[in-house]
Amino acid sequence: MSRIKRGTTTRAKHKRILDQAKGYYGRRKNTIRIARQAVEKAGQYAYRDRKVKKRSFRALWIQRINAAVRAEGLTYSQFMHGVKLAGIELDRKVMADLAMNEGGVFTAIVAQAKAALPKAA
């Protein structure tokens, strides 16, 4: 039985890690032990931030809608309540886009939401 040396597999593993660490600063790009840690941490950040990205965009849409709605004399929560009562089925992403780019259309939606709100006694 001949002896098996694992040089080729080790080199392939190292090459894969160093390719992923391309563009990193200092020894992170060319020292395997440090590059492995950096690539691992980068993967953890990427996984976490794919979740955070969804929250961040939702918060951005809410801020944009809130700013546009306050110019019309409503708060965000009042507007969303009016939208629900009026039966308007647009999500926050679309409404934020309308508020930014199609002011007239958004003003019409705000008017519908205002009309659907119950009058204060």
UniProtKB/Swiss-Prot annotation:
Name this polypeptide is given: Large ribosomal subunit protein bL20
Gene Ontology BP term (one): ribosomal large subunit assembly
Gene Ontology CC: one annotated term: ribonucleoprotein complex
Q: So what family is this one in?
A: Belongs to the bacterial ribosomal protein bL20 family.
Among Gene3D superfamilies, the record links this protein to: 6.10.160.10, Ribosomal protein L20 (1.10.1900.20)
Query: What InterPro entries does this protein map onto?
Result: Ribosomal_bL20 (IPR005813), RIBOSOMAL_L20_CS (IPR049946), Ribosomal_protein_bL20_C (IPR035566)
This molecule's function is given as: Binds directly to 23S ribosomal RNA and is necessary for the in vitro assembly process of the 50S ribosomal subunit. It is not involved in the protein synthesizing functions of that subunit.
Q: Which Pfam families match?
A: Ribosomal_L20
Report if keyword Ribonucleoprotein is assigned.
Answer: yes
| Keyword set, alphabetical order | Ribonucleoprotein, Ribosomal protein, RNA-binding, rRNA-binding
GO molecular function: any one? structural constituent of ribosome
| Leader sequence residues | none
Classification via NCBIfam families: rplT_bact (TIGR01032)
Species of origin reads Sphingopyxis alaskensis (strain DSM 13593 / LMG 18877 / RB2256) (Sphingomonas alaskensis)
